[in-house]
Amino acid sequence: MPTFEIFSREPDLRTFRSGEAIFREGDPGDCLFAIVEGEVDIQVRGAVVDHLAAGSVFGEMALIDGLPRIATALAATDCKLAAVSEKRFLRL
């Protein structure tokens, strides 16, 4: 299934304000995200390790390995994200 189809079928769209935490290091990983609009910073121990823009996917590692989140994701700008739940991800 093409990536765009994964996020366009029954999208779970979530909005975050600039500076708002999408998830935090140590949180359980219950979904992954694709950035529809805006930008996201990925931080480890308070340091920005990646800056993501529209079209990027993040948060998948916690679904793959079943471990808590290893990073914090913060909205760098106002964002609209498409979320894919663990259940839906495992059906792909």
Predicted regions and their residues:
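Cyclic-nucleotide recognition modules
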Residues: 9, 50-92
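Regulatory nucleotide-sensing modules
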Residues: 1-45
